[in-house]
Amino acid sequence: MSYGLLFLRVVVGLVFFAHGAQKLLGWWGGPGIAGTKELLGQIGFRTPGALAPIVALSEASGLLLAAGFLTPFAALVLAAAMVVAIGSVHWRKGFWNMGQGYEFNLVLLSVPIAITATGPGRFSVDRAIGWDDNLSGPIWGVAVLTLALVGALFVLVVLRARREAATA
């Protein structure tokens, strides 16, 4: 099982990191921090300048997931980022990824939660320093999902202008 968890952590963690690097540094054709700020403003966030580096760094924390280091923290940040992405961009476009729906984001949301619930595996930093037994399990998975939903709801409700105002 540890080999499967290692593979899953590394692949999904690097996918998250790549998206964060696009937003933060403009790598791989990404918008960079200025473009991320502009995008956040276009979709109705009130403080896009403050949120842009937070959004980019939250996705770049996929490196923590890939390494299996501070796994619940990485899962919380990544899951919250995906809930915000679903709520602010993808939900209204339907389920299927082909139409920019939330299908892909839902998968990305579920993997860090599942890894927290099962533990990062034998080949992880958390295991190497003896934290994995204390920072994983079903209760941790539920706690991370709950906190991610609450945090994302705060961002979507408090930090985002009403939709009518954003499109006016």
Predicted regions, residues:
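Extended, low-polarity transmembrane helix blocks
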Residues: M1-W27, G49, T71-A168
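Hydrophobic, membrane-facing alpha-helical anchors
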Residues: A21-I33, L57-S61
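Membrane-interface interhelical connector segments
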Residues: G26-L51
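Internal, well-ordered alpha-helical scaffold/interface segments
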Residues: A34, E38, V55, G68, ...
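Helix-loop interface residues and adjacent transmembrane-helix termini in multi-pass membrane transporters
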Residues: G44, G68-L70
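Short hydrophobic alpha-helical membrane-embedded segments
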Residues: A50-S58
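Hydrophobic, membrane-inserted alpha-helices
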Residues: L57-A66, V89
